[in-house]
């Protein structure tokens, strides 16, 4: 049970990133009602796709990575494609977290410490927990997660009493904005790259992994809804639009909330929350990347690497990009939605489709049957095509 609790918090901690706080800017022109529907729908979609991995792990060893699952049903080609997409995506995310974490750490260090030293220190300090092992990540994540929740509770306690029901009844200024916001909220429910690590940590316990995914994602959904409720209830739609014109950043949102609540505590609590959210996301993503590399070496090259070697392979490439070629990971992140959709929706749907033919009587099957698999696949593909429609001018732009 202790590992199950830790795994649940790792699911939530990986999903709840610093970007959560700026999500109301994405939904600024939509209104709370449609934002709520969108969040519930995408949570259901991505929780369903995550549970497909639980079904799959009944047919594989508990330490099998996503690449191994792909090879089991689609051969070497499946492994190559699945591993390449996942590693590129996770490397890009880690580079972004390292860069952001270094900037946060720089504010706490003497001026003589430059940007590169701050980035290096952040990587060494928090990367060490990942190198030590999942148990170590579990322990530090629990502490950070509960402090993060405390900071979030402080913010909510100051904002919720000030909300106005009329603000929550605002309707979209343009219904097309609902479609445009979908990809941003879609990726906000991403933790699927960490599922192999969690399954290994839980020794292949299907019930425990299912519980961790359902409860961890539900915690995230509740946090997203409460934050949207607080901001949309506090600010009118006109005030949101003014923020988008003057300062479409988290800082602009914090200033607007201060103007209404008059509390300086909000800014401090928001900064603490965003810092801890970045770290917990880094831990979850980093753990998933390290074990993806371990799976690749072990099963494709018959190499059993030590944790330090795996740590170097995990963190040196994104560290180099963050220090010397930031344009590289920014370019990769430009296709983050497409890569995420592939390994979080397209891949598990395809694998389960084949697994159900090969193993007709699995003890646990995700609800819905093959028709639901097709619907989920189509929705995933449609959502990832939306950014292209925005760039082409067919849909309105949103922040995010």
Swiss-Prot record:
Q: Which GO terms describe its biological process?
A: amino acid transmembrane transport
Q: Which Pfam families match?
A: Trp_Tyr_perm (PF03222)
Recorded superkingdom: Bacteria
Write down the chemical reaction(s) this protein catalyses: L-tyrosine(in) + H(+)(in) = L-tyrosine(out) + H(+)(out)
Q: Does the keyword DNA-binding apply?
A: no
Q: Name one GO molecular function term.
A: aromatic amino acid transmembrane transporter activity
Q: Which NCBIfam families match?
A: araaP (TIGR00837)
Family from the record = Belongs to the amino acid/polyamine transporter 2 family. Mtr/TnaB/TyrP permease subfamily.
Protein name, entry field: Tyrosine-specific transport system 1
Organism (species): Haemophilus influenzae (strain ATCC 51907 / DSM 11121 / KW20 / Rd)
């Amino acid at each position: 049970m202790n590992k199950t609790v830790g795994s649940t918090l790792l699911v939530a901690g990986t999903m709840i990133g610093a970007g959560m706080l700026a999500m109301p800017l994405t939904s600024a022109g939509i209104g709370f009602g449609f934002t709520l529907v969108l969040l519930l729908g995408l949570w259901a979609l991505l929780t369903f796709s995550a549970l497909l991995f639980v079904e799959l792990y009944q047919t594989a060893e508990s330490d099998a990575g996503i690449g191994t699952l792909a090879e089991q049903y689609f051969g070497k080609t499946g492994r190559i494609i699945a591993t390449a997409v996942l590693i590129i995506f996770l490397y890009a995310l880690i580079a972004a977290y390292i860069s952001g974490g270094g900037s946060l750490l720089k504010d706490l260090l003497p001026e003589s410490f430059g940007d590169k030293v701050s980035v290096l220190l952040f990587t060494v300090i928090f990367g060490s927990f990942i190198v030590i092992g999942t148990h170590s990540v579990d322990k530090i994540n629990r502490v950070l997660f509960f402090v993060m929740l405390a900071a979030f509770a402080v913010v909510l306690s100051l904002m919720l009493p000030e909300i106005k029901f009329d603000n929550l009844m605002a309707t979209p200024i343009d219904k097309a904005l609902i479609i445009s916001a979908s990809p941003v909220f879609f990726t906000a429910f991403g933790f699927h790259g960490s599922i192999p690590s969690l399954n290994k940590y839980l020794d292949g316990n299907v019930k425990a992994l299912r519980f961790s995914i359902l409860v961890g994602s539900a915690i995230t959904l509740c946090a997203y809804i409460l934050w949207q409720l607080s901001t949309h209830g506090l600010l009118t739609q006109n005030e949101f639009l003014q923020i988008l014109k003057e300062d479409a950043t988290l800082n602009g949102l914090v200033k607007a909330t201060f103007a209404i609540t008059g509390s300086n505590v909000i800014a401090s609590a928001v900064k603490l929350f965003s810092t801890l959210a970045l770290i917990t996301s880094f831990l979850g993503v980093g753990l998933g990347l390290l074990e993806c590399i371990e799976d690749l070496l072990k099963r494709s090259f018959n190499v059993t690497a030590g944790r330090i070697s795996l740590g170097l392979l995990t963190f040196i490439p994104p560290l180099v990009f963050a220090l010397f070629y930031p344009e590289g990971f920014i370019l990769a992140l430009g296709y983050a939605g497409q890569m995420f959709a592939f390994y979080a929706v397209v891949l598990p749907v395809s694998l389960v489709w084949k697994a159900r033919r090969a193993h007709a009587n699995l003890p646990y099957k995700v609800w819905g049957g093959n028709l639901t698999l097709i619907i989920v696949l189509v929705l995933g593909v449609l959502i990832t095509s939306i950014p292209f429609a925005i760039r082409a001018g067919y849909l309105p732009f949103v922040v995010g």
